[in-house]
Protein backbone atom coordinates (compact mmCIF):
# COMPACT_ATOMS: atom_id res chain seq x y z
CA UNK A 1 0.00 0.00 0.00
CA UNK A 2 1.37 3.41 -1.02
CA UNK A 3 0.53 5.92 1.70
CA UNK A 4 1.58 9.52 2.26
CA UNK A 5 1.40 11.25 5.60
CA UNK A 6 -1.74 13.36 6.03
CA UNK A 7 -1.50 16.93 7.27
CA UNK A 8 -1.87 16.18 10.97
CA UNK A 9 -2.19 19.89 11.73
CA UNK A 10 -5.77 19.60 10.47
CA UNK A 11 -6.62 16.87 12.97
CA UNK A 12 -8.43 17.50 16.23
CA UNK A 13 -9.00 14.50 18.48
CA UNK A 14 -10.82 14.11 21.79
CA UNK A 15 -9.35 11.49 24.13
CA UNK A 16 -11.47 10.29 27.05
CA UNK A 17 -10.29 7.65 29.46
CA UNK A 18 -8.21 6.51 32.37
CA UNK A 19 -5.25 8.85 32.80
CA UNK A 20 -2.23 7.93 34.88
CA UNK A 21 1.32 8.98 35.63
CA UNK A 22 4.15 6.59 34.78
CA UNK A 23 7.23 7.02 36.96
CA UNK A 24 10.56 5.40 36.07
CA UNK A 25 13.51 4.93 38.41
CA UNK A 26 16.73 3.96 36.64
CA UNK A 27 20.02 2.82 38.12
CA UNK A 28 22.74 0.15 38.16
CA UNK A 29 22.47 -3.10 40.10
CA UNK A 30 25.69 -4.61 41.41
CA UNK A 31 24.76 -6.46 44.59
CA UNK A 32 22.07 -8.39 46.45
CA UNK A 33 20.46 -6.88 49.54
CA UNK A 34 21.59 -8.39 52.88
CA UNK A 35 18.00 -7.94 54.10
CA UNK A 36 16.37 -10.23 51.51
CA UNK A 37 17.34 -12.04 48.27
CA UNK A 38 16.56 -9.04 46.08
CA UNK A 39 18.80 -6.78 43.95
CA UNK A 40 19.79 -3.34 45.22
CA UNK A 41 19.25 -0.58 42.66
CA UNK A 42 21.21 2.65 43.08
CA UNK A 43 18.71 5.11 41.62
CA UNK A 44 20.44 7.68 39.41
CA UNK A 45 17.68 8.92 37.11
CA UNK A 46 13.99 9.57 37.69
CA UNK A 47 11.53 10.20 34.85
CA UNK A 48 7.82 10.99 34.81
CA UNK A 49 5.71 10.36 31.73
CA UNK A 50 1.97 10.56 31.05
CA UNK A 51 0.44 7.09 30.83
CA UNK A 52 -2.82 5.42 29.89
CA UNK A 53 -5.18 7.78 28.08
CA UNK A 54 -2.65 10.57 28.69
CA UNK A 55 -0.07 8.66 26.65
CA UNK A 56 -2.63 8.35 23.86
CA UNK A 57 -3.00 12.14 23.86
CA UNK A 58 0.80 12.52 23.88
CA UNK A 59 1.03 10.33 20.78
CA UNK A 60 -1.50 12.51 19.00
CA UNK A 61 0.25 15.74 19.97
CA UNK A 62 3.64 14.38 18.87
CA UNK A 63 2.27 14.21 15.33
CA UNK A 64 1.38 17.90 15.34
CA UNK A 65 -2.34 17.22 15.77
CA UNK A 66 -4.53 18.85 18.42
CA UNK A 67 -5.42 16.64 21.38
CA UNK A 68 -7.97 17.36 24.08
CA UNK A 69 -7.84 15.03 27.07
CA UNK A 70 -10.69 14.31 29.50
CA UNK A 71 -10.18 12.04 32.51
CA UNK A 72 -10.25 11.67 36.28
CA UNK A 73 -7.41 12.64 38.62
CA UNK A 74 -6.90 13.28 42.28
CA UNK A 75 -5.80 16.59 43.76
CA UNK A 76 -2.16 15.75 44.39
CA UNK A 77 1.43 16.05 43.18
CA UNK A 78 0.91 13.30 40.59
CA UNK A 79 -1.98 15.22 39.01
CA UNK A 80 0.12 18.38 38.89
CA UNK A 81 3.06 16.51 37.36
CA UNK A 82 0.74 14.97 34.79
CA UNK A 83 -0.71 18.35 33.81
CA UNK A 84 2.75 19.89 33.58
CA UNK A 85 4.08 17.18 31.25
CA UNK A 86 1.01 17.42 29.03
CA UNK A 87 1.11 21.22 28.90
CA UNK A 88 4.70 20.99 27.66
CA UNK A 89 3.55 19.14 24.53
CA UNK A 90 0.41 21.27 24.06
CA UNK A 91 -2.19 18.69 25.09
CA UNK A 92 -5.32 20.48 26.29
CA UNK A 93 -6.18 18.96 29.68
CA UNK A 94 -9.78 19.04 30.86
CA UNK A 95 -9.58 16.85 33.95
CA UNK A 96 -12.26 16.17 36.53
CA UNK A 97 -10.51 16.35 39.91
CA UNK A 98 -11.73 14.00 42.65
CA UNK A 99 -10.24 15.18 45.98
CA UNK A 100 -10.87 11.92 47.84
CA UNK A 101 -8.98 9.74 45.34
CA UNK A 102 -5.28 9.63 44.36
CA UNK A 103 -4.17 10.07 40.78
CA UNK A 104 -3.34 6.64 39.35
CA UNK A 105 0.44 6.24 39.39
CA UNK A 106 2.62 3.35 38.23
CA UNK A 107 6.23 3.23 39.40
CA UNK A 108 8.71 1.07 37.49
CA UNK A 109 12.23 0.30 38.70
CA UNK A 110 14.68 -0.52 35.90
CA UNK A 111 18.31 -1.54 35.69
CA UNK A 112 20.24 -2.13 32.47
CA UNK A 113 17.03 -1.60 30.50
CA UNK A 114 15.31 -4.44 32.40
CA UNK A 115 12.21 -3.80 34.48
CA UNK A 116 12.68 -5.28 37.95
CA UNK A 117 9.39 -4.37 39.61
CA UNK A 118 6.27 -2.26 39.11
CA UNK A 119 4.43 -0.60 41.99
CA UNK A 120 0.86 0.63 41.44
CA UNK A 121 -0.63 3.47 43.48
CA UNK A 122 -4.36 3.53 42.81
CA UNK A 123 -7.80 3.03 44.27
CA UNK A 124 -9.82 3.41 41.08
CA UNK A 125 -12.66 5.84 40.48
CA UNK A 126 -15.65 3.54 40.83
CA UNK A 127 -18.92 5.25 41.70
CA UNK A 128 -17.84 8.69 40.48
CA UNK A 129 -20.64 10.81 38.96
CA UNK A 130 -20.26 10.56 35.14
CA UNK A 131 -22.04 13.88 34.58
CA UNK A 132 -18.96 16.14 34.44
CA UNK A 133 -17.19 13.90 31.92
CA UNK A 134 -20.28 13.61 29.70
CA UNK A 135 -20.66 17.40 29.79
CA UNK A 136 -17.07 17.85 28.64
CA UNK A 137 -17.62 15.40 25.79
CA UNK A 138 -20.74 17.25 24.60
CA UNK A 139 -18.83 20.51 24.62
CA UNK A 140 -15.87 19.13 22.63
CA UNK A 141 -17.68 17.07 19.96
CA UNK A 142 -18.44 19.95 17.53
CA UNK A 143 -14.72 20.74 17.27
CA UNK A 144 -13.19 17.27 16.80
CA UNK A 145 -12.83 14.81 13.93
CA UNK A 146 -12.48 11.67 16.05
CA UNK A 147 -13.02 10.45 19.61
CA UNK A 148 -10.88 7.90 21.44
CA UNK A 149 -12.19 6.06 24.49
CA UNK A 150 -9.14 4.61 26.24
CA UNK A 151 -10.29 1.98 28.72
CA UNK A 152 -8.03 0.68 31.47
CA UNK A 153 -10.98 -0.32 33.69
CA UNK A 154 -10.18 2.35 36.28
CA UNK A 155 -13.59 4.05 36.26
CA UNK A 156 -13.38 6.96 33.82
CA UNK A 157 -15.44 5.06 31.22
CA UNK A 158 -18.11 3.75 33.57
CA UNK A 159 -20.75 5.33 31.28
CA UNK A 160 -19.09 4.26 28.04
CA UNK A 161 -22.41 3.54 26.27
CA UNK A 162 -23.58 7.09 26.86
CA UNK A 163 -20.26 8.34 25.46
CA UNK A 164 -20.60 6.21 22.32
CA UNK A 165 -24.14 7.46 21.77
CA UNK A 166 -23.04 11.09 22.11
CA UNK A 167 -20.32 10.62 19.49
CA UNK A 168 -22.55 8.70 17.08
CA UNK A 169 -25.33 11.27 17.36
CA UNK A 170 -22.77 13.95 16.50
CA UNK A 171 -21.49 11.95 13.52
CA UNK A 172 -17.99 11.67 14.97
CA UNK A 173 -16.08 8.35 14.66
CA UNK A 174 -15.48 6.75 18.05
CA UNK A 175 -12.47 4.45 18.46
CA UNK A 176 -12.06 2.27 21.54
CA UNK A 177 -9.10 0.44 23.03
CA UNK A 178 -11.06 -2.19 25.02
CA UNK A 179 -10.44 -3.75 28.41
CA UNK A 180 -11.84 -7.01 29.75
CA UNK A 181 -14.22 -9.45 28.09
CA UNK A 182 -17.50 -7.51 28.26
CA UNK A 183 -17.55 -6.14 24.73
CA UNK A 184 -21.28 -5.45 25.09
CA UNK A 185 -20.14 -2.22 26.77
CA UNK A 186 -18.72 -1.08 23.42
CA UNK A 187 -21.80 -1.73 21.30
CA UNK A 188 -22.08 0.71 18.42
CA UNK A 189 -18.44 1.81 18.32
CA UNK A 190 -16.89 2.77 14.98
CA UNK A 191 -13.69 0.81 15.61
CA UNK A 192 -12.53 -1.55 18.33
CA UNK A 193 -8.79 -2.31 18.67
CA UNK A 194 -8.27 -5.40 20.87
CA UNK A 195 -4.96 -7.22 20.89
CA UNK A 196 -5.04 -10.91 20.04
CA UNK A 197 -5.25 -12.13 23.62
CA UNK A 198 -8.11 -9.73 24.39
CA UNK A 199 -9.87 -10.82 21.20
CA UNK A 200 -9.46 -14.54 21.94
CA UNK A 201 -10.66 -14.04 25.52
CA UNK A 202 -14.01 -13.05 23.99
CA UNK A 203 -14.29 -15.30 20.90
CA UNK A 204 -12.13 -18.28 21.92
CA UNK A 205 -8.78 -19.56 20.71
CA UNK A 206 -8.15 -19.00 16.99
CA UNK A 207 -5.93 -21.49 15.14
CA UNK A 208 -5.77 -19.73 11.78
CA UNK A 209 -6.17 -16.34 10.16
CA UNK A 210 -9.48 -17.47 8.70
CA UNK A 211 -10.78 -18.18 12.19
CA UNK A 212 -9.75 -14.68 13.25
CA UNK A 213 -11.64 -13.27 10.28
CA UNK A 214 -14.77 -15.38 10.75
CA UNK A 215 -15.03 -14.79 14.49
CA UNK A 216 -14.15 -11.13 14.09
CA UNK A 217 -16.94 -10.56 11.57
CA UNK A 218 -19.37 -12.36 13.86
CA UNK A 219 -18.23 -10.13 16.73
CA UNK A 220 -18.83 -7.03 14.63
CA UNK A 221 -22.33 -8.18 13.77
CA UNK A 222 -23.11 -9.07 17.37
CA UNK A 223 -22.03 -5.72 18.81
CA UNK A 224 -22.88 -3.45 15.86
CA UNK A 225 -19.27 -2.45 15.21
CA UNK A 226 -18.34 -0.67 11.98
CA UNK A 227 -14.80 -2.09 11.97
CA UNK A 228 -12.45 -4.23 14.05
CA UNK A 229 -8.64 -4.07 14.21
CA UNK A 230 -6.93 -7.02 15.89
CA UNK A 231 -3.32 -6.26 16.81
CA UNK A 232 -1.24 -9.45 16.76
CA UNK A 233 2.26 -8.55 18.01
CA UNK A 234 4.90 -10.13 15.75
CA UNK A 235 2.18 -11.21 13.30
CA UNK A 236 1.11 -7.65 12.56
CA UNK A 237 -2.50 -6.51 12.39
CA UNK A 238 -5.77 -7.64 10.84
CA UNK A 239 -8.41 -5.07 9.85
CA UNK A 240 -12.00 -6.18 9.33
CA UNK A 241 -14.69 -3.97 7.78
CA UNK A 242 -18.24 -4.69 6.72
CA UNK A 243 -18.47 -5.74 3.07
CA UNK A 244 -14.73 -5.28 2.45
CA UNK A 245 -12.04 -7.95 2.16
CA UNK A 246 -9.89 -8.39 5.30
CA UNK A 247 -6.62 -6.49 5.34
CA UNK A 248 -3.61 -8.26 6.88
CA UNK A 249 -0.55 -6.11 7.63
CA UNK A 250 2.74 -7.74 8.69
CA UNK A 251 4.66 -6.16 11.55
CA UNK A 252 7.23 -3.49 10.72
CA UNK A 253 9.12 -3.79 13.99
CA UNK A 254 12.84 -4.46 13.51
CA UNK A 255 13.67 -4.90 17.21
CA UNK A 256 11.37 -5.13 20.22
CA UNK A 257 12.61 -3.61 23.49
CA UNK A 258 9.35 -2.74 25.24
CA UNK A 259 5.68 -3.07 24.27
CA UNK A 260 4.57 -0.63 27.00
CA UNK A 261 2.14 1.85 25.46
CA UNK A 262 2.19 0.30 21.97
CA UNK A 263 -1.61 0.05 21.99
CA UNK A 264 -1.78 3.75 22.87
CA UNK A 265 0.38 4.57 19.86
CA UNK A 266 -1.81 2.48 17.55
CA UNK A 267 -5.13 4.03 18.53
CA UNK A 268 -3.64 7.53 18.68
CA UNK A 269 -2.29 7.20 15.15
CA UNK A 270 -5.58 5.77 13.90
CA UNK A 271 -7.63 8.65 15.28
CA UNK A 272 -5.22 11.40 14.20
CA UNK A 273 -5.04 9.97 10.67
CA UNK A 274 -8.82 9.65 10.35
CA UNK A 275 -9.34 13.16 11.72
CA UNK A 276 -6.81 14.43 9.16
CA UNK A 277 -8.77 12.85 6.30
CA UNK A 278 -7.10 9.46 5.80
CA UNK A 279 -9.14 6.36 4.99
CA UNK A 280 -9.36 3.59 7.57
CA UNK A 281 -7.04 1.40 5.47
CA UNK A 282 -4.47 4.20 5.29
CA UNK A 283 -4.83 4.95 8.99
CA UNK A 284 -4.18 1.30 9.86
CA UNK A 285 -1.10 1.22 7.64
CA UNK A 286 0.29 4.25 9.45
CA UNK A 287 -0.64 2.81 12.86
CA UNK A 288 1.19 -0.41 12.02
CA UNK A 289 4.29 1.55 11.03
CA UNK A 290 4.09 3.64 14.20
CA UNK A 291 3.80 0.54 16.37
CA UNK A 292 6.93 -0.84 14.73
CA UNK A 293 8.80 2.29 15.80
CA UNK A 294 7.52 2.59 19.36
CA UNK A 295 8.24 -0.99 20.44
CA UNK A 296 11.89 -0.27 19.68
CA UNK A 297 11.93 2.28 22.50
CA UNK A 298 12.00 1.77 26.26
CA UNK A 299 8.91 2.72 28.27
CA UNK A 300 5.81 4.63 27.20
CA UNK A 301 6.91 6.55 24.12
CA UNK A 302 5.59 8.53 21.19
CA UNK A 303 6.34 8.63 17.47
CA UNK A 304 7.25 11.80 15.58
CA UNK A 305 6.28 12.49 11.94
CA UNK A 306 9.95 12.11 11.00
CA UNK A 307 10.18 8.65 12.56
CA UNK A 308 6.91 7.70 10.91
CA UNK A 309 8.11 8.96 7.54
CA UNK A 310 11.32 6.97 7.92
CA UNK A 311 9.32 3.87 8.78
CA UNK A 312 7.00 4.01 5.78
CA UNK A 313 9.71 5.08 3.32
CA UNK A 314 12.55 2.96 4.66
CA UNK A 315 14.87 5.97 4.73
CA UNK A 316 16.49 4.99 7.99
CA UNK A 317 17.74 1.84 6.27
CA UNK A 318 19.21 3.69 3.28
CA UNK A 319 21.13 6.14 5.44
CA UNK A 320 19.85 9.20 3.56
CA UNK A 321 16.80 11.48 3.58
CA UNK A 322 14.78 12.73 6.55
CA UNK A 323 16.49 11.78 9.79
CA UNK A 324 16.36 12.12 13.54
CA UNK A 325 19.28 13.81 15.29
CA UNK A 326 20.74 10.52 16.52
CA UNK A 327 20.50 8.97 13.05
CA UNK A 328 22.17 12.04 11.56
CA UNK A 329 25.03 11.94 14.07
CA UNK A 330 25.70 8.34 13.09
CA UNK A 331 25.54 9.16 9.37
CA UNK A 332 27.92 12.12 9.78
CA UNK A 333 30.37 10.01 11.78
CA UNK A 334 30.38 7.37 9.04
CA UNK A 335 30.85 10.04 6.36
CA UNK A 336 33.87 11.44 8.16
CA UNK A 337 35.33 7.98 8.55
CA UNK A 338 35.14 7.76 4.74
CA UNK A 339 37.01 11.07 4.47
CA UNK A 340 33.98 13.02 3.23
CA UNK A 341 33.49 16.75 3.82
CA UNK A 342 30.15 17.58 5.47
CA UNK A 343 28.38 20.84 4.57
CA UNK A 344 25.39 22.18 6.50
CA UNK A 345 22.84 24.91 5.87
CA UNK A 346 19.42 25.82 7.19
CA UNK A 347 16.18 27.61 6.39
CA UNK A 348 12.39 27.47 6.20
CA UNK A 349 12.15 26.32 2.55
CA UNK A 350 8.39 26.79 2.56
CA UNK A 351 7.56 27.06 -1.14
CA UNK A 352 10.61 25.61 -2.86
CA UNK A 353 11.65 27.65 -5.91
CA UNK A 354 14.53 27.88 -8.40
CA UNK A 355 16.54 30.12 -6.09
CA UNK A 356 16.45 27.49 -3.36
CA UNK A 357 17.45 24.73 -5.76
CA UNK A 358 20.37 26.76 -7.15
CA UNK A 359 21.55 27.73 -3.66
CA UNK A 360 21.45 24.14 -2.38
CA UNK A 361 23.26 22.85 -5.46
CA UNK A 362 26.01 25.45 -4.93
CA UNK A 363 26.29 24.52 -1.26
CA UNK A 364 26.58 20.82 -2.14
CA UNK A 365 29.45 21.52 -4.55
CA UNK A 366 31.50 22.80 -1.61
CA UNK A 367 31.69 19.35 -0.04
CA UNK A 368 30.69 15.71 -0.29
CA UNK A 369 27.51 15.65 1.82
CA UNK A 370 24.88 18.34 2.45
CA UNK A 371 22.73 18.61 5.58
CA UNK A 372 19.67 20.88 5.49
CA UNK A 373 18.21 21.87 8.87
CA UNK A 374 14.59 23.01 8.54
CA UNK A 375 12.56 25.25 10.85
CA UNK A 376 9.59 23.47 12.42
CA UNK A 377 6.08 24.77 11.81
CA UNK A 378 6.02 26.59 15.16
CA UNK A 379 9.47 28.08 14.56
CA UNK A 380 8.41 29.23 11.08
CA UNK A 381 5.26 30.90 12.43
CA UNK A 382 7.29 32.81 15.00
CA UNK A 383 9.72 34.03 12.34
CA UNK A 384 7.41 34.57 9.36
CA UNK A 385 4.02 35.25 10.93
CA UNK A 386 0.89 33.23 11.75
CA UNK A 387 0.02 32.51 8.10
CA UNK A 388 3.26 30.62 7.55
CA UNK A 389 4.29 28.01 6.76
CA UNK A 390 2.16 27.31 3.72
CA UNK A 391 3.45 23.73 3.62
CA UNK A 392 3.77 21.67 6.84
CA UNK A 393 7.16 20.51 8.06
CA UNK A 394 6.91 16.93 6.83
CA UNK A 395 6.06 18.04 3.29
CA UNK A 396 8.85 20.61 3.24
CA UNK A 397 11.37 18.00 4.37
CA UNK A 398 10.15 15.44 1.83
CA UNK A 399 10.62 17.88 -1.05
CA UNK A 400 14.12 18.80 0.14
CA UNK A 401 15.07 15.14 0.61
CA UNK A 402 14.07 14.44 -2.99
CA UNK A 403 16.63 16.93 -4.35
CA UNK A 404 19.80 15.43 -5.78
CA UNK A 405 21.96 17.98 -3.95
CA UNK A 406 20.57 17.15 -0.50
CA UNK A 407 21.77 14.15 1.49
CA UNK A 408 20.19 14.63 4.91
CA UNK A 409 17.27 16.69 6.23
CA UNK A 410 16.59 17.36 9.91
CA UNK A 411 14.13 19.67 11.70
CA UNK A 412 14.73 22.03 14.59
CA UNK A 413 12.21 23.67 16.95
CA UNK A 414 14.12 26.78 18.04
CA UNK A 415 14.15 30.15 16.28
CA UNK A 416 17.75 29.53 15.20
CA UNK A 417 19.63 26.30 14.42
CA UNK A 418 22.49 27.14 16.80
CA UNK A 419 21.89 24.15 19.10
CA UNK A 420 21.68 21.56 16.35
CA UNK A 421 24.67 23.02 14.48
CA UNK A 422 26.69 22.84 17.70
CA UNK A 423 25.63 19.20 18.06
CA UNK A 424 26.55 18.21 14.49
CA UNK A 425 29.57 20.54 13.97
CA UNK A 426 29.81 20.34 10.16
CA UNK A 427 33.10 20.87 8.37
CA UNK A 428 31.53 23.80 6.51
CA UNK A 429 28.53 25.91 7.55
CA UNK A 430 26.85 27.77 4.69
CA UNK A 431 24.22 30.52 4.79
CA UNK A 432 22.61 32.49 1.99
CA UNK A 433 22.17 36.26 2.00
CA UNK A 434 24.21 39.26 3.09
CA UNK A 435 25.34 37.97 6.48
CA UNK A 436 28.84 38.29 7.85
CA UNK A 437 30.29 34.89 8.84
CA UNK A 438 30.46 35.88 12.51
CA UNK A 439 26.73 36.74 12.47
CA UNK A 440 25.58 33.30 11.35
CA UNK A 441 23.92 31.14 14.03
CA UNK A 442 26.25 28.31 14.99
CA UNK A 443 29.19 29.88 13.20
CA UNK A 444 31.28 30.47 16.31
CA UNK A 445 30.89 26.85 17.38
CA UNK A 446 31.87 25.54 13.94
CA UNK A 447 34.95 27.77 13.74
CA UNK A 448 35.99 26.84 17.29
CA UNK A 449 35.86 23.18 16.25
CA UNK A 450 38.15 23.83 13.28
CA UNK A 451 35.44 24.22 10.63
CA UNK A 452 34.64 26.98 8.14
CA UNK A 453 31.74 29.38 7.63
CA UNK A 454 30.81 30.81 4.22
CA UNK A 455 28.10 33.05 2.81
CA UNK A 456 26.54 32.30 -0.58
CA UNK A 457 24.46 34.62 -2.73
CA UNK A 458 20.82 33.87 -3.48
CA UNK A 459 19.60 33.90 -7.08
CA UNK A 460 18.05 37.28 -7.91
CA UNK A 461 14.31 37.49 -8.47
CA UNK A 462 13.36 34.39 -6.49
CA UNK A 463 11.38 34.81 -3.28
CA UNK A 464 8.81 32.73 -1.43
CA UNK A 465 7.06 35.91 -0.29
CA UNK A 466 6.79 37.11 -3.91
CA UNK A 467 5.30 33.79 -4.96
CA UNK A 468 2.71 33.99 -2.17
CA UNK A 469 1.82 37.57 -3.16
CA UNK A 470 1.42 36.59 -6.82
CA UNK A 471 -0.92 33.75 -5.84
CA UNK A 472 -2.97 36.09 -3.66
CA UNK A 473 -3.23 38.68 -6.43
CA UNK A 474 -4.43 35.97 -8.80
CA UNK A 475 -7.11 34.95 -6.34
CA UNK A 476 -8.30 38.54 -6.02
CA UNK A 477 -8.44 39.18 -9.80
Swiss-Prot record:
ATP binds at residues 195-198. Gene3D superfamilies: 3.40.1190.20, HUPs. Residues 1-318 are annotated as: Ribokinase. GO terms for biological process: ADP-L-glycero-beta-D-manno-heptose biosynthetic process. It catalyses: D-glycero-beta-D-manno-heptose 7-phosphate + ATP = D-glycero-beta-D-manno-heptose 1,7-bisphosphate + ADP + H(+); D-glycero-beta-D-manno-heptose 1-phosphate + ATP + H(+) = ADP-D-glycero-beta-D-manno-heptose + diphosphate. The active site is at residue 264. One of its GO terms (cellular component) is cytosol. Disulfide bonds: none annotated. Residues 344-477 are annotated as: Cytidylyltransferase. Pfam families: CTP_transf_like (PF01467), PfkB (PF00294). One of its GO terms (molecular function) is heptose-1-phosphate adenylyltransferase activity. Pathway: Nucleotide-sugar biosynthesis; ADP-L-glycero-beta-D-manno-heptose biosynthesis; ADP-L-glycero-beta-D-manno-heptose from D-glycero-beta-D-manno-heptose 7-phosphate: step 1/4; Nucleotide-sugar biosynthesis; ADP-L-glycero-beta-D-manno-heptose biosynthesis; ADP-L-glycero-beta-D-manno-heptose from D-glycero-beta-D-manno-heptose 7-phosphate: step 3/4. Its EC number is 2.7.1.167, 2.7.7.70. Keywords: ATP-binding, Carbohydrate metabolism, Kinase, Multifunctional enzyme, Nucleotide-binding, Nucleotidyltransferase, Transferase. In the N-terminal section; belongs to the carbohydrate kinase PfkB family. In the C-terminal section; belongs to the cytidylyltransferase family. HAMAP family: HldE. Homodimer. Catalyzes the ADP transfer from ATP to D-glycero-beta-D-manno-heptose 1-phosphate, yielding ADP-D-glycero-beta-D-manno-heptose. This is Bifunctional protein HldE. It comes from Edwardsiella ictaluri (strain 93-146).
Amino acid sequence: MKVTLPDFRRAQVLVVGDVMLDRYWYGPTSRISPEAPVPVVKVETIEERPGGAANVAMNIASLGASARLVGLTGVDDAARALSTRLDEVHVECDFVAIPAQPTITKLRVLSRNQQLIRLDFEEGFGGVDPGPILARIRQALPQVGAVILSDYAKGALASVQAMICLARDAGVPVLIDPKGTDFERYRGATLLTPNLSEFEAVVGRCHSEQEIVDRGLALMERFDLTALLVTRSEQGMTLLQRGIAPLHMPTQAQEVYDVTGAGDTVIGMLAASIAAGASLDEACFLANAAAGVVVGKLGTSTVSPIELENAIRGRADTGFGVMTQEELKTAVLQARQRGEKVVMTNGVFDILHAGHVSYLANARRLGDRLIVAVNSDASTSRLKGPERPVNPLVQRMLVLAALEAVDWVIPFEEDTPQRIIAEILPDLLVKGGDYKPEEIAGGKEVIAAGGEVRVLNFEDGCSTSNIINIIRQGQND
